[in-house]
């Protein structure tokens, strides 16, 4: 089942974030993998999707400087955690800093993973991102 929707939540003083119960259903074994994402966000995956993702990252190749850099950046800033009894996950201070996450967080479902965005960073990203029609046109041209 795809992860969908947008939710606003608040990061507490201990760096914990409540994940909506509807989204937590995708994390049946409770293992949560958190990593630096693209475009200024933090990615959250269940174990099955994490294994698929790390396989893709590894396939970028260790033979090139770019492949090694991508692997190092993603893997060195990743963390494995679990949900606490209140449905919260802990976001490391390293990831909070890299993604400029302060207090107000936007949680979006992005098909196979969640993305965590600082509210202000998300608003700037959405404002600057291509409109859906433009993105669809560019997508069609690449097919």
Curated annotation (Swiss-Prot):
GO terms for biological process: negative regulation of DNA-templated transcription initiation. Belongs to the MraZ family. GO terms for cellular component: cytoplasm; nucleoid. Pfam families: MraZ. This is Transcriptional regulator MraZ. PROSITE patterns: SPOVT_ABRB. Keywords: Cytoplasm, DNA-binding, Repeat, Transcription, Transcription regulation. It comes from the Bacteria. InterPro entries: MraZ (IPR003444), MraZ_C (IPR035644), MraZ_dom (IPR020603), MraZ_N (IPR035642), MraZ_sf (IPR038619), SpoVT-AbrB_dom (IPR007159), SpoVT-AbrB_sf (IPR037914). It is found in: Cytoplasm, Nucleoid. GO terms for molecular function: DNA-binding transcription factor activity; transcription cis-regulatory region binding. Residues 6-49, 78-121 form the SpoVT-AbrB domain. PANTHER family: TRANSCRIPTIONAL REGULATOR MRAZ (PTHR34701:SF1). The keyword Transcription applies. Forms oligomers.
